[in-house]
Amino acid sequence: MAPVDIPDRDRLIVALDLPDLRVAEAMVDRLGDSVGFYKIGYQLAYAGGLPLARALVGAGKKVFVDLKLHDIGNTVARGVESLSHLGASFLTVHAYPQTMKAAVEARGSSKVKILAVTVLTSYDDRDLADAGYRFGVRDLVEARARQAQAIGVDGLVCSPEEAAHLRSIVGPEMDLVTPGIRPAGAAAGDQKRIMTPAKAIAAGASYLVVGRPVLDAPDPKAAADAIVAEIAAARGS
């Protein structure tokens, strides 16, 4: 089972995959109190969006900084030290042992949780084979999850298709954060391993990352409300 002490609204993380700070701020205003948790990734971070993380935290929101750090240990450590001052709740690194160890050690006394990215949800077995991996997605995800837990990482970013299997491996304490969430009828886009919000929660996901189905909706606030309602129904809240 996923951790149970998370409010339904905070289980939805809206990905602010938007081109500039003004557009992102307008979307946050539009979503209002329907969303309490936001993800800032490459696109917005590199367009000057990291100050928005501080502003969101100051406004009582939670922030997930999704930069998927992957470099030599010292460089990752310095990056984590700098990013930890944003007040973010989550920070991602790629699930390589040296990277994970450096991140866990470098966060110090900050409250940021380190999440390890197992295998990107746009990858399938063929993609891994093309990249030279001997493992398929399932085996590689499992191996990386076990390493992450042993190192002391707080949670995993994984496909919702892997959530149930990983929950059986890592137990109830680790957070499972799942992108690749598509409400019924939504386009899959470039994601290959997707699931509806209700099914992902039932599979053991702790948090659901949703971007385009909210951002591109005619009424983003209503779209977010509908996903939170689906989460609540799946949990029997």
From Swiss-Prot:
The active site is at residue 68. Substrate binds at residues 17, 39, 66-75, 121, 182, 191, 211-212. Disulfide bonds: none annotated. One of its GO terms (cellular component) is cytosol. Keywords: Decarboxylase, Lyase, Pyrimidine biosynthesis. InterPro entries: Aldolase_TIM, OMPdecase, OMPdecase_AS, OMPdecase_bac, OMPdeCOase_dom, RibuloseP-bd_barrel. It is an enzyme of class 4 (lyase). One of its GO terms (biological process) is 'de novo' UMP biosynthetic process. Pathway: Pyrimidine metabolism; UMP biosynthesis via de novo pathway; UMP from orotate: step 2/2. It catalyses: orotidine 5'-phosphate + H(+) = UMP + CO2. Its EC number is 4.1.1.23. It holds the Pfam family OMPdecase. One of its GO terms (molecular function) is orotidine-5'-phosphate decarboxylase activity. Homodimer. Catalyzes the decarboxylation of orotidine 5'-monophosphate (OMP) to uridine 5'-monophosphate (UMP). Belongs to the OMP decarboxylase family. Type 1 subfamily. This is Orotidine 5'-phosphate decarboxylase. It comes from Rhodopseudomonas palustris (strain ATCC BAA-98 / CGA009). The lineage of its organism: Bacteria, Pseudomonadati, Pseudomonadota, Alphaproteobacteria, Hyphomicrobiales.
